């Protein structure tokens, strides 16, 4: 099922853990609508701006899958409202800054960020059509969360050094 021009339901629900453990990771109709919103409001604009394919590492997670990976059942992933992703050749911090400045979102987290590796980790972003999006921005270094994104050196819209 095509969710948007560049994103399919299959890539937004794919999980090696679900496959290995025999967990049904099928979203309901409301979850699918939320995934479509994430695609249209976040992923498609990001893909258009960077003009590169996006690799989704985690989209929808059933409650059973959330439990299996140690995530909260209340995670926005369990509602189809969140996605984790990367773009080959684009530092994740650059992607996160672009989303912060150009998209409506509920929560944006630069996950497992290391200052000496701006391409490390991944971007987590959520979108909530049902309510006001909080525009919460966090950076997680693997130990603790900090408000906002780290300061970076920029030249012509690209992270340097």
Feature-to-residue mapping (PLM):
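Extended, low-complexity, intrinsically disordered C-terminal regulatory tails
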Residues: 44-70
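Short, flexible, solvent-exposed loop/turn segments with mixed acidic/basic and small polar residues
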Residues: 68-78, 114-116
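Acidic, His- and aromatic-enriched active-site or binding-groove loops in soluble protein domains
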Residues: 73-93
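A broad, low-specificity signal marking well-ordered, structured residues that form hydrophobic/aromatic
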Residues: 54, 83, 122-123
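Extracytoplasmic cell-surface/polysaccharide-interacting catalytic and binding patches
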Residues: 1-49, 142-161
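Amphipathic alpha-helical interface surfaces
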Residues: 38-42, 65, 81, 91, ...
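Catalytic cores and adjacent binding grooves of peptidoglycan-active enzymes
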Residues: 87-161
């Amino acid at each position: 099922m095509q969710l948007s021009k560049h994103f399919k339901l299959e890539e937004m629900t794919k999980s090696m853990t679900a496959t290995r453990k025999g967990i049904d990771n099928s979203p309901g109709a409301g979850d699918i609508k939320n995934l479509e919103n994430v695609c249209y409001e976040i992923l498609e604009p990001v893909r258009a701006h960077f003009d590169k394919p996006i690799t989704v590492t985690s989209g929808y997670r059933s409650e059973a899958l959330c439990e299996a990976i140690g995530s909260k059942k209340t995670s926005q992933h369990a509602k189809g409202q969140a996605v984790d992703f990367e773009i080959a050749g684009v530092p994740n911090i650059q992607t996160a800054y672009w989303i912060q400045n150009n998209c409506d979102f509920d929560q944006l987290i630069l996950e497992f960020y290391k200052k000496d590796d701006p391409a490390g980790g991944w971007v987590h972003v959520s979108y909530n059509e049902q309510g006001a999006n909080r525009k919460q921005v966090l950076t997680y270094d693997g130990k603790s969360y900090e408000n906002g994104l780290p300061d970076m050196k920029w030249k012509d819209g690209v992270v340097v050094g």
